[in-house]
C-alpha cells in the first residue's frame, strides 16, 4: 500500500497532462525499443523521426496512463480493472508480457524527469508495476496466452 501511495504522490503532473506525458512515454518506448512499435499496427508505418509529437501516439499514450492511474488508485485491489485489460492484450493485441516490463522502465525514467519521482518513488513504481505485471501474467496464463 505504501508503494502505491508513494507513486500517487507524484501522479499529479501525469494527470494534469495525460496526452503530453503519454506521448513522452510511448515515444521513448519506441525509440529505446523499436521492436515494440510493431506491436501497434496503427503506428507501425510511422518513421522514427516522426514519432515525437505524433498526435495519435500521444492520444494512445494518454489512454495507457489513464488506465494505469485507475490501477494505481485501486492500490492492489485491481482485479476488475486488470481482467478486461489482460483479456484484450492477450487475445486481441497479443502483447507479450515482457513489453509491460519495458514500458514500466520507460515510465520510471519519464516520471523521474517530468514528475519529480525521486529514488524512493522510482523503487515504489517498480514494485507497483511488478505487482500489476505479475497479476496480468496470471490472467494471461488463465487465458492460455504465454506472452
Curated annotation (Swiss-Prot):
Nitrite binds at residue 60. One of its GO terms (biological process) is removal of superoxide radicals. Heme b binds at residue 89. Keywords: Acetylation, Cytoplasm, Heme, Iron, Metal-binding, Muscle protein, Oxidoreductase, Oxygen transport, Transport. Monomeric. O2 binds at residue 60. GO terms for cellular component: extracellular exosome; sarcoplasm. The modification N-acetylalanine is found at residue 2. It is an enzyme of class 1 (oxidoreductase). GO terms for molecular function: heme binding; metal ion binding; nitrite reductase activity; oxygen binding; oxygen carrier activity; peroxidase activity. This is Myoglobin. SUPFAM superfamilies: Globin-like. It catalyses: Fe(III)-heme b-[protein] + nitric oxide + H2O = Fe(II)-heme b-[protein] + nitrite + 2 H(+); H2O2 + AH2 = A + 2 H2O. It holds the Pfam family Globin. Residues 2-141 form the Globin domain. It comes from Thunnus albacares. It is found in: Cytoplasm, Sarcoplasm. Monomeric heme protein which primary function is to store oxygen and facilitate its diffusion within muscle tissues. Reversibly binds oxygen through a pentacoordinated heme iron and enables its timely and efficient release as needed during periods of heightened demand. Depending on the oxidative conditions of tissues and cells, and in addition to its ability to bind oxygen, it also has a nitrite reductase activity whereby it regulates the production of bioactive nitric oxide. Its EC number is 1.7.-.-, 1.11.1.-. Belongs to the globin family.
Amino acid at each position: 500500500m505504501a508503494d502505491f501511495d508513494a507513486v500517487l504522490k507524484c501522479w499529479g503532473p501525469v494527470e494534469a497532462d495525460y496526452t503530453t506525458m503519454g506521448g513522452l512515454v510511448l515515444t521513448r518506448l519506441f525509440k529505446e525499443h523499436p521492436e515494440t512499435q510493431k506491436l501497434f499496427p496503427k503506428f507501425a508505418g510511422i518513421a522514427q523521426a516522426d514519432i515525437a509529437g505524433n498526435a495519435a501516439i500521444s492520444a494512445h499514450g494518454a489512454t495507457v496512463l489513464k488506465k494505469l492511474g485507475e490501477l494505481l488508485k485501486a492500490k492492489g485491489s485491481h482485479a476488475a480493472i486488470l481482467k478486461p485489460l489482460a483479456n484484450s492484450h492477450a487475445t486481441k493485441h497479443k502483447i507479450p508480457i515482457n513489453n509491460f516490463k519495458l514500458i514500466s522502465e520507460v515510465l520510471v525514467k519519464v516520471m523521474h524527469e517530468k514528475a519529480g519521482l525521486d529514488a524512493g518513488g522510482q523503487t515504489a513504481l517498480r514494485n507497483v508495476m511488478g505487482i500489476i505485471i505479475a497479476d496480468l501474467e496470471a490472467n494471461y496464463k488463465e487465458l492460455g496466452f504465454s506472452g
